[in-house]
């Protein structure tokens, strides 16, 4: 048991960065190996580390254990009991004799004992009170961070729609507080903004550098400001938020009209950026399109890196469905994933909801194998909505609502900028999303000539290729119209 664990750690040192070894592997304590059941019991110091190691490293440890014991082994992680448990020492890598590459040195009990390479004496067991205090402290830190450990870079499905956002998020996780500060991610509901910012937080915590992290939804931040005001505790409020190394603010559009909240956030923003501490913000829209937000804040948001997350393309939607089905332990044929992805195009949340509906339908109706017919039956309500005809009238109403103008302005002869652009956008979408000819579209826009429609289509098409903000707006409108 002792020899196996030392060898296991040595092998993991060859595969993982030193920070991950220090943060996640060294704190683990092997408790016992049950030969009859082929179960290896390993203790983690607190619930946060237990959950993280189980999700991210259990497969590697189980593979090494299976190689050592020459049979499949289940690794069972648990929290330490209050009784003391002897700790198997693991000395830093510098004290270890050179180890051959993993492929050249198979694990086997007959190999020379790896523990012989260690000269350090065993560490004394931690006292129960100290262990309990450490667990409590770690849990408190984790609770304060509010991170969801399920949301990582490893299980984030990447495609054209979000590859730039993921690349920026990875860069920030590896080099916080430098060039991309703040990082501002924007896009529609259910496209993965929240997943990405949790992934950044989890990656920084996993690096084991002791960073102080806080994820907070904008509504909760507003609530924190109100409580600080009621309790006359603004000094404590400022001290806490200004002390963070990483602040993740989700859905900042909810700050709209809340002047005191915006003022406090402005002070926190200035203090953190001055100390090269990282701020990451998400929103449903581009910074300059935020309403009810102080211009000073909008200027600060624009000072870093702003990245859009677009609705997922077909291939990405298929990959998301296959990954989700795999995580649920359900084999899904690709043609089934393609069928769902072709008919549901708006966001990741909708896709996952549709998959849950299909799985539940199959389970309740005794359908063992997933196929397209099962999907059609399970999703008939959703499919009837998503297959609805897109009309020019529907486009005009949707665009008018988005730009906050009257539908009648679509037909009028008025040409101020706040009306001309939405009208051209609506003409462009009518050409892209319906079978109407240019003259027919012109008639539906107040009897305009087909050359006017053609000019609008070309103008918006060219602008879309050059302006990220307009491209994002068009994506939002297209997905809204397609359902």
From Swiss-Prot:
Q: Where does ATP bind?
A: 190, 192-194
| Database matches in SMART domains | AAA, Bac_DnaA_C
User: Annotated region Domain I, interacts with DnaA modulators: where?
Assistant: 1-71
Q: Which domain of life is it from?
A: Bacteria
- Comment on protein domains: Domain I is involved in oligomerization and binding regulators, domain II is flexibile and of varying length in different bacteria, domain III forms the AAA+ region, while domain IV binds dsDNA.
HAMAP family according to UniProt: DnaA_bact
Name under which the protein is recorded: Chromosomal replication initiator protein DnaA
